């Protein structure tokens, strides 16, 4: 299972056009996508946050590691679900399409794979903070998935990709900021 997750993450990042076509043909169920791809990736990010705090700080602080992993878990899960929900609403409101939350959960999950992979690397190796710029590559991943996976026409593709990328990238960040503001004990 973990090899398959790793292969899909690499495929989506390195060859998004080909990966989206394969994912569209695969036609997997929502539960399968979530339990075999998204949830394990969020688990990896959470474990990376825990280990990153334990091994990259000068002091060995278990409490701080638990706080970091809780904040990461809540912001990743919340960002994923809130992003899918918001895009489902925008899908109907702005793009005049029929709501399909299951489709959006899969699309946001696969589109977030670069963000999850970067979070894992940056939590374990914080010295490579400059890699954060590659998060903008999510725009291209969403662009390639808009046609084959979501069936978006060329004339509205740019607007679709702009909305989707902004929501995928901003919802976890907003939730993390809100958590830090509402619960100052989670800030460090």
Predicted regions and their residues:
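Hydrophobic alpha-helical transmembrane segments and adjacent short intramembrane/lumenal linkers
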Residues: 88, 92-173
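Selected alpha-helical membrane-embedding segments in polytopic membrane proteins
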Residues: 2-99
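Short, intrinsically disordered/low-complexity patches at protein termini
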Residues: 45, 54-55, 138-139, 181-183
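Juxtamembrane boundary at the C-terminal end of a transmembrane helix
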Residues: 171-188
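Transmembrane helix-loop junctions in multi-pass membrane proteins
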Residues: 50-63, 118-126, 174-179
């Amino acid at each position: 299972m973990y090899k398959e997750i790793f292969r899909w993450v690499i495929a989506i990042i390195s060859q998004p056009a080909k990966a989206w076509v394969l994912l569209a043909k695969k036609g997997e169920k929502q539960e399968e996508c979530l339990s075999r791809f998204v949830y394990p990736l969020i688990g990896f990010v959470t474990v990376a946050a825990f280990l990153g705090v334990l091994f990259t700080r000068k002091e060995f602080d278990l409490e701080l590691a638990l706080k970091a992993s809780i904040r990461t878990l809540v912001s990743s899960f919340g960002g994923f679900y809130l992003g899918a929900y918001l895009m489902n609403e925008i899908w109907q409101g702005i793009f005049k399409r029929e709501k399909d939350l299951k489709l959006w959960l899969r699309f946001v999950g696969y589109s977030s794979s670069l963000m999850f992979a970067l979070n894992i690397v940056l939590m374990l190796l914080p010295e490579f903070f400059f890699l954060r710029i590659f998060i903008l590559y999510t725009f291209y991943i969403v662009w390639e998935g808009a046609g084959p996976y979501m069936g978006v026409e060329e004339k509205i593709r740019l607007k679709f990709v702009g909305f989707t990328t902004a929501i995928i990238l901003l919802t976890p960040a907003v939730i993390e900021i809100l958590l830090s503001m509402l619960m100052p004990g989670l800030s460090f």
